[in-house]
Curated annotation (Swiss-Prot):
Cellular compartments per GO CC: DNA-directed RNA polymerase complex
Gene label: rpoE
All copies of domain HTH HARE-type, residue ranges: 14-81
Cleaved signal peptide residues: none
Family annotation (Pfam families): HARE-HTH
NCBIfam families for the chain: RNAP_delt_lowGC
Job of this protein: Participates in both the initiation and recycling phases of transcription. In the presence of the delta subunit, RNAP displays an increased specificity of transcription, a decreased affinity for nucleic acids, and an increased efficiency of RNA synthesis because of enhanced recycling.
Keyword Nucleotidyltransferase: yes
Region (Disordered) location: 114-182
Listed name of the protein: Probable DNA-directed RNA polymerase subunit delta
Organism taxonomic ancestry: Bacteria, Bacillati, Bacillota, Bacilli, Bacillales
Organism name: Staphylococcus saprophyticus subsp. saprophyticus (strain ATCC 15305 / DSM 20229 / NCIMB 8711 / NCTC 7292 / S-41)
Length: 182
C-alpha cells in the first residue's frame, strides 16, 4: 500500500519510523527531516502540538535504526542505497586543518591567539550591575512586604524551626526509651 493511501487511523496506528521507511522507498530519494514530518502532518491531519511527542520519538528512532542514514544537513536516506565506501565517505568526520605556528609567528606581537580578543572586550563590563545593587536592600519597603507575605503563608520554613522540630522528636524518642526501660 502506498503511503498516500493511508487513512488518519492508519497513520495514528503506524509508527513514524516505519512510515518514513515506506515514504523514502516510494520516493527513492533522500528527504529533509522537516519535509518527512510535513508529509506525516498532512497524512494524519495533525496540528503541531498533536504531533510533537511523536516527532521526538521519531528522531530518536531515525538515529538508532540501522535502515536510515543521515547524509548531512538533516537529509535522510536509506542505508540500502549506498555502498560501504559511499557510507564511509558521507559519514566520515571532517578534519579542520590549522596552520602550525613557527618561531617567527610566536615572536609577532600583533598576532592574537584564539580567545585573546574576547578577553579584552570584557574590560568595560561593570563588576556590579544596577539590578544587583538594589537586591536585598534593607531600606526597600517592598522587601518587607514580601517577607510578611511569606511569613503569613508559611511557605518558607526557617532552618531554626526545622532544627527545633528535630530536637523535639529526638527528646520524645529519648523519653519514650526511658519510660520503656523503667
Amino acid at each position: 500500500m502506498r503511503i498516500q493511501d493511508y487513512t488518519k487511523e492508519m497513520v495514528d496506528e503506524k509508527s513514524f519510523i516505519d512510515m518514513a521507511y515506506t515514504l523514502l522507498n516510494e520516493k527513492n530519494d533522500t528527504m529533509n527531516l522537516y519535509d518527512i514530518i510535513d508529509e506525516f502532518k498532512a497524512l494524519g491531519h495533525y496540528e503541531d502540538d498533536e504531533i510533537e511527542n511523536r516527532i521526538v520519538q521519531f528522531y530518536t528512532d531515525l538515529n538508532t535504526d540501522g535502515r536510515f542514514l543521515n547524509v548531512g544537513e538533516n537529509i535522510w536516506g536509506l542505508r540500502d542505497w549506498y555502498s560501504v565506501a559511499d557510507i564511509e565517505e558521507k559519514i566520515a568526520p571532517t578534519i579542520q586543518k590549522f596552520d602550525i605556528l613557527d618561531d617567527d609567528d610566536e615572536e609577532d606581537k600583533n598576532l592574537k591567539l584564539l580567545g585573546e580578543d574576547e578577553a579584552d572586550d570584557d574590560d568595560d563590563i561593570p563588576a556590579v550591575t544596577d539590578d544587583q545593587e538594589t537586591l536585598n536592600d534593607p531600606e526597600d519597603p517592598e522587601d518587607d512586604d514580601v517577607d510578611e507575605d511569606l511569613n503569613e503563608t508559611d511557605i518558607v520554613i526557617d532552618e531554626d524551626d526545622e532544627d527545633l522540630d528535630e530536637e523535639d522528636e529526638e527528646e520524645e524518642e529519648f523519653e519514650d526509651e526511658e519510660e520503656t526501660e523503667e
